[in-house]
Amino acid sequence: MALQCVLGAGRTGKTDYIYQQMIKESMENRDENFFFLVPDQSTLNAQRELITRHPNHGTMNIDVVGFYRLSYRVFEELSYIPKELLNDEGKSMVIRKVMGECRKDLLVFGSGMEKQGFIDEMKSFFAETYQYDVSLEKLKEAVKSFENTDSLTLKMKDIVLVLEKFEDYMKDRYLVSEQLLDVLAQKITESEKLKGATIYIDGFTGFTPIQNKVLKKLLPYAKKIVAAFTIDEKRAGGPYRDYELFAMPKKEISQLKEMAVRQGVPIQIGRAHV
């Protein structure tokens, strides 16, 4: 187990380094599993680039995946069948249904649910709570800390009520796509393919909390994780401020380092040498 952060400004060879090292190591260790983790929308381009660069013009023992595709790889390996995924239209229908059922208990949103775009806004909020690993219990605790009765507090109480009804309805029936990564995090240590695998990561500016939850589980379980970040090595150290230019990569490097240290995973940080 090891963590390597590859740093460098834009167009300084980080991606070239990732491809070169990944191909080299995969050819030297043909019996080992390699994963190339990229944003979900970039998997096709990454596969094409890998095939072009590989001497054998094939991905061989390298699996190009996004976080969601990685979920399905693990589920398939374990013969695990997750609950049926609810699409966007289905989410809207369920939200509208549960809001209708608890409409009389809503403090603010009861009269607004028929407005154009309202259900979509609620759906987006729910998606973000799952992506950022904000549970219903955390929201309830936050609302309890509000002591006033202003508009924001009343809206938050409505949101908590609707989310609770939404999750009650979904339980034992469906999953939303944003919940898949939480299931993946729970299943990682059951996967033989991920055990001792080498994972290369490129194309991300940062990770959501639920993605970090997956990476935290992978760090001690994989043989090595190599992640590229667009930031000069000199800028990567020290504290960061949310509004500074390179806040996202600095924050992510800091979080990965903290997760690695807490789990006794060795860390190497430096620029790419192509």
Mark where each language-model region is.
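Conserved RecA-like ASCE P-loop NTPase motor core of nucleic-acid helicases/translocases
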Residues: I18, D31-T43, A227
